[in-house]
Amino acid sequence: MNAVMSLKGRDFLTLLDFSTEEILDLLALAADLKAKQKAGVSYTPLSGKTMAMIFEKPSGTRVSFEVGMIQLGGQAMYLNGNHLQLGRGETIADTARVLSQYVRVIMIRTFAHQKVEELAEYASFRSSNGLTDDDHPCQALADLLTIYEVKKTFQGVKLAYVGDGNNVANALLVAAAKVGMDVAIACPPGYEPKKEYVEAACRVGEQTGRRVTVTHDPLVAVAGADRIYTDVWTSMGQESESSERLQVFQPYQVNEELVKAAKPDYLFLHCLPAHRGEEVTAGVMDGPNSVVFEQAGNRLHAQKAILLSVL
């Protein structure tokens, strides 16, 4: 339960803000909460506390956060653009100050990462980043839990990500490097992860002795991989680029031929929703090496660990 003590009163905006030990503590707490639920143990330490959830992007993230808060004994309140004045001139700072009068924690899923940072700056409550265009730390924590559950270690594990260098790739770079995995990202030229995330992961890799690779060759990334990860080629807000992206990313499809380069017992991960026939074939997505639905389930436990730790 060290995570509950060490993160009390902190915001959860990016894994860049957390040490290796703090991330491992969060994962241990998530695993403990998962075991409690599996055993049917009622655990409600957040009774009397309310979470507000702000969504500027439609998402299934609401389900896992809301269920998690309820299971911990608290309440969750969903807010979209129609419930707030953000789209009609109210500043993020004012919204933060107002909501601070009512709730103890807020989860926001938005486009600009700056909005999350500004919300945290002006709020007297804790803030959690449900997703921005730059980062997806809650998903990355669930991914780490999924990866860890199989071998109970990160040492000697190679994670390969193939596809768009988006928010998921940014978060995974940092997450993998911090827990001691080798990580390789393969993406088309011009679609690489953000420079600051690559540089941060490389700095961590130098300290931990792990390899961080960004390449344009999917075979280089997947060679000898223990875990293979991909995401959609066209994210929300990029619909006008869809036709172009389908052409550019076609060589980066995770298919039966590509996964031959990985270890035979590789696991396939995807943050969902998936487009079978685009970034991944149905054979890989629905095959015996796929753990995508277990991965989705782990969002609940990872997010419960975050909520319990910061409140």
Swiss-Prot record:
Keyword presence, ATP-binding: no
UniProt cross-references to InterPro entries, sorted A to Z: Asp/Orn_carbamoyltranf_P-bd, Asp/Orn_carbamoylTrfase, Asp/Orn_carbamoylTrfase_sf, Asp_carbamoyltransf_Asp/Orn-bd, Orn/put_carbamltrans, OTCase_ArgI
Gene Ontology CC terms: cytoplasm
Biological or metabolic pathway of the protein: Amino-acid biosynthesis; L-arginine biosynthesis; L-arginine from L-ornithine and carbamoyl phosphate: step 1/3
Gene3D superfamilies: Aspartate/ornithine carbamoyltransferase (3.40.50.1370)
Location, primary (coarse class): cytoplasm
Gene label: argF
Catalytic activity line of the entry: carbamoyl phosphate + L-ornithine = L-citrulline + phosphate + H(+)
Protein name (record): Ornithine carbamoyltransferase
Organism for this UniProt entry: Geobacillus stearothermophilus (Bacillus stearothermophilus)
Broad EC category: transferase
Enzyme Commission numbers on file: 2.1.3.3
Residues that bind carbamoyl phosphate: Q85, R109, H136, P137, C138, Q139, C271, L272, R299
Pfam families per the UniProt record, alphabetical: OTCace, OTCace_N
Subcellular location: Cytoplasm
BP terms from Gene Ontology: arginine biosynthetic process via ornithine; citrulline biosynthetic process; L-arginine biosynthetic process
Similarity section: Belongs to the aspartate/ornithine carbamoyltransferase superfamily. OTCase family.
Role according to the record: Reversibly catalyzes the transfer of the carbamoyl group from carbamoyl phosphate (CP) to the N(epsilon) atom of ornithine (ORN) to produce L-citrulline.
Gene Ontology molecular function: any one: amino acid binding
Keywords of this entry: Amino-acid biosynthesis, Arginine biosynthesis, Cytoplasm, Transferase
UniProt: L-ornithine binding residues: N167, D231, S235, M236
